[in-house]
């Protein structure tokens, strides 16, 4: 979910508490999915207890189906399970009010959150030089002054690093990827293609040969958004879980260790405790995450996963080092990166120019991959490295917001 279309920000508040398990409600503007919920276990719940809980759930649902009258609509029940890093266990599915009441009273349950729609967020060594760059953001990242047209970078260019792009998919056959992009997993439909274009644009900025910051990085498409650039929060979390397992060596991915992996999430929706907790589990596993701050011109604390402190939250800057008028801001923003009128790849072999914090975040993801390729330590601490390297450049960044603009340390 990039920030092309407007993501709806909402704050989750406790609706009720039954035996300690909170049922959260979405704010007044949330695009909730009827009868769909995410159920999060208490942190101390073990794998064995989680399995026992889901068995209890299935038995409870079966009893309800047997008692149900023919005129009542049957709910689908549990549809997905999540386990991230041993600290986040949850499941999602379709449940009626009575079942949600039963689930909330179970001792293993920490909280229950309504599922909702999430949308894209678009609106000094021997250096290699790329002259007359096709997108101004490339030149800006490698120069201490605005207005340049050359991108300076080390030839290592992120080789040996894998970037997971959690988005609308990637046109892996686009010639600018030179065979470095592949499909990972699709959680939204049966079409392994980017029918929206957002994910391909994002991936191009991360690691395109001509348009990307890390020109040697391997790219993996994790599709969680459909052709309209939208999907469910539960589906996004499922994509996050898969990417974390692959990046940690639990699957058959190209990243053999979490420290050699980066993730980009140019998407967001209302503030979600479940989404933030899943993002924290990924960070705790030693994986660097760049996340779009959002495009509502408000405090990023109202958007997820941008409001999770352990990720690297990115606001959007303009070509003259101003804050993009749409960009979110606030204390949770870690850095600014180019995000207005960014040219990158489009499915089918062409290019497109888009604006949004969705375009800013992949600059940071690409920079993260580039720095790991240079030997910098990966993981969430890489965001601190990026902030230390950044320079004060953004004019009027927003109340309580950093003025730091990313820089790759080229010395130029």
Curated annotation (Swiss-Prot):
Keywords: Glycoprotein, Hydrolase, Protease, Secreted, Serine protease, Signal, Virulence, Zymogen. Residues 1-20 form the signal peptide. GO terms for molecular function: serine-type endopeptidase activity. Residues 21-127 form a propeptide. Residues 135-412 form the Peptidase S8 domain. Residues 36-120 form the Inhibitor I9 domain. GO terms for biological process: proteolysis. Pfam families: Inhibitor_I9, Peptidase_S8. Its EC number is 3.4.21.-. It comes from the Eukaryota. The active site is at residues 167, 198, 358. It is found in: Secreted. Glycans are attached at residues 123, 126, 252, 264, 408. PROSITE patterns: SUBTILASE, SUBTILASE_ASP, SUBTILASE_HIS, SUBTILASE_SER. One of its GO terms (cellular component) is extracellular region. CDD domains: Peptidases_S8_PCSK9_ProteinaseK_like (cd04077). InterPro entries: PCSK9_ProteinaseK-like (IPR034193), Peptidase_S8/S53_dom (IPR000209), Peptidase_S8/S53_dom_sf (IPR036852), Peptidase_S8_Asp-AS (IPR023827), Peptidase_S8_His-AS (IPR022398), Peptidase_S8_Ser-AS (IPR023828), Peptidase_S8_subtilisin-like (IPR050131), Peptidase_S8_subtilisin-rel (IPR015500). Belongs to the peptidase S8 family. Secreted subtilisin-like serine protease with keratinolytic activity that contributes to pathogenicity. This is Subtilisin-like protease 6. It comes from Trichophyton tonsurans. The lineage of its organism: Eukaryota, Fungi, Dikarya, Ascomycota, Pezizomycotina.
């Amino acid at each position: 979910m990039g920030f092309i279309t407007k993501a709806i920000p909402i704050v989750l508040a406790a609706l009720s508490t039954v035996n300690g398990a909170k049922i959260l409600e979405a704010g007044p503007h949330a695009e909730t999915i009827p009868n769909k919920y995410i159920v999060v276990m208490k942190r101390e719940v073990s794998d064995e207890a989680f399995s026992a809980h889901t068995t209890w759930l299935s038995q409870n649902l079966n009893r309800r189906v047997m008692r149900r009258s023919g005129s009542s609509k049957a709910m689908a029940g549990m549809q997905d399970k999540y386990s991230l890093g041993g600290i986040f266990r949850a499941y999602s599915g379709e449940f009626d009010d009575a079942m949600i009441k039963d689930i909330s009273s179970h001792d293993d349950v920490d909280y229950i959150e309504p599922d909702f729609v999430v949308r894209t967020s678009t609106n000094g060594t021997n250096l290699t030089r790329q002259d007359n760059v096709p997108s101004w953001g490339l030149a800006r990242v490698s120069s201490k002054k605005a207005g340049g047209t050359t991108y300076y970078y080390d030839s290592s260019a992120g080789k040996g690093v894998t970037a997971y792009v959690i988005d609308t998919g990637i046109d892996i056959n686009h010639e600018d990827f030179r065979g470095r992009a592949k499909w990972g997993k699709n959680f939204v439909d049966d079409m392994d293609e980017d029918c929206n274009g957002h994910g391909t644009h994002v991936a191009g900025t991360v690691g395109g040969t001509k348009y990307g910051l890390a020109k040697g990085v391997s790219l993996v498409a994790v599709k969680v958004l459909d052709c309209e650039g939208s999907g469910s929060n539960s589906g996004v979390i499922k994509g996050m879980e898969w990417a974390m397992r692959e990046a940690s060596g639990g699957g058959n991915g190209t990243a053999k260790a979490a420290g050699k992996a980066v993730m980009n999430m140019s998407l967001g929706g209302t503030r979600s405790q479940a989404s933030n907790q899943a993002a924290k589990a990924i960070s705790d596993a030693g994986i660097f995450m760049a996340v779009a701050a959002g495009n509502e011109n408000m405090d990023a604390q109202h958007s997820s996963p941008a409001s999770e402190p352990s990720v690297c939250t990115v606001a959007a800057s303009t070509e003259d080092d101003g804050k993009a008028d749409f960009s979110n801001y606030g204390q949770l923003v870690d850095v600014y990166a180019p995000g207005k009128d960014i040219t990158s790849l489009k499915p089918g072999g062409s290019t497109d120019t888009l604006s949004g914090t969705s375009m800013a975040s992949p600059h940071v993801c690409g920079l993260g991959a580039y720095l790991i390729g240079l030997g910098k330590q990966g993981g969430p601490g890489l965001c601190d490295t990026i902030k230390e390297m950044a320079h004060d450049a953004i004019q009027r960044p927003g109340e309580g917001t950093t003025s730091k603009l990313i820089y790759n340390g080229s010395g130029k």
